[in-house]
Amino acid sequence: MLTEGMYIDHVIYGVLDVDAAAERLRRDYGLGSVPGGIHLGGTTNRIVPLAPPTFLELLGVGDPTLGDGVWLAEALAGRDRLLWWVLGVDDLDETARRRGLPTQVGMMDMADGSQRTFRTAGMPRYPLPFFISFDIDPGARMRIWQARYRDAGHDCGPGAFSFLEVGDTPELLDAWLGDHGLPVRHVPGAASGIHAVGIETARGELVIC
């Protein structure tokens, strides 16, 4: 497969308490965050803006009676943990077509009262990464993200993701992504999915696991 313009759009850090996790990341790493919103499937989040438009998503249970809220509570099993990684692509429809995947529409009620929509492909293949496209002009998204970065008030000057550690074999991941060129490190013998992530900062690389 071609590279398809893949980049790490965001990493999902599943947490028991979104606000408490945000405070801990501020205290331990100097990472600020901004309010996110409520996904219609029953999860809620805060956003840690990194080099625009990438981010670390703090994802918690918003409504434990809805499907995604139930799934997240089960996946966390009583502890905060890295949960998933998400890739942006040039053309979501083409990426989905090449893999025989349907696309799905997601919606989110934002803290500012607005509503955002996005499309995904590949979410049922968890914990392999899924693909995402936001229904917003790329230039407008970049401006929003630059403002969020300022509003977060980071103490460490975070930049881009420097690496991801995953338990999936190179063969499995290459079959899923193709020639991706992403900064992925494989951990032999580890369970499938993401285990650690590196973030470039003005203080040096920080690692969350």
Q: For each of these PLM feature ranges, what is it?
A:
Residues L16-L76:
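Glycine/small-residue-rich interface belts in oligomeric ring/scaffold proteins
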Residues G41, G78-D80, R125:
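Short coil/turn motifs at beta-sheet boundaries
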Residues M6-D17, R46-A51, L56-E57, V70-T169, G181-C209, ...:
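Vicinal oxygen chelate
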Residues V18-Y29, E94-R99, T169-H180:
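Amphipathic alpha-helical segments
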